[in-house]
Each structure stands twice: as structure tokens, then as C-alpha cells.
Swiss-Prot record:
GO terms for cellular component: extracellular region. The keyword Cytoplasm does not apply. It is found in: Secreted. It comes from Xenopus laevis. Residues 1-20 form the signal peptide. This is PYLa/PGLa A. The modification Leucine amide is found at L59.
Length: 64
């Protein structure tokens, strides 16, 4: 079960990293949108990390 959770977190981190990378051919008008998306992706990643920590703590308390 922990392997599945770990795999899910790794995939989420990789997706967030890929989404946060800016492309080299972006127009000046699109830069603002990309910055907004990058900010949202990093916030989503932080929230997902906090949820994962809470879930792992809850699972740890349940097992012991």
C-alpha cells in the first residue's frame, strides 16, 4: 500500500515539475498566463504534499 502511495506522490511531483517549466517560445502576452499557471501548479503541489502528510500520519496512527 505504501508503494502505491509513494508512486502516486512521485508521479504528482513529476507532473507538477513538468507543468511549472516555461517553454522557450512563449510570446510576451502569454508570459503572464504562464506565470499564473506556474503559481497555481506550485500551490497545488504544496496542498497535495500537505494532504499526503496528513494521510500518512493517519495511516501510521491507525496501524499502531
Amino acid at each position: 500500500m505504501y508503494k502505491q502511495i509513494f508512486l502516486c506522490l512521485i508521479i504528482a511531483a513529476l507532473c507538477a515539475t513538468i507543468m511549472a517549466e516555461a517553454s522557450a517560445f512563449a510570446d510576451a502576452d502569454e508570459d503572464d498566463d504562464k506565470r499564473y499557471v506556474r503559481g497555481m501548479a506550485s500551490k497545488a503541489g504544496a496542498i497535495a504534499g500537505k494532504i499526503a502528510k496528513v494521510a500518512l500520519k493517519a495511516l501510521g496512527r491507525r496501524d499502531s
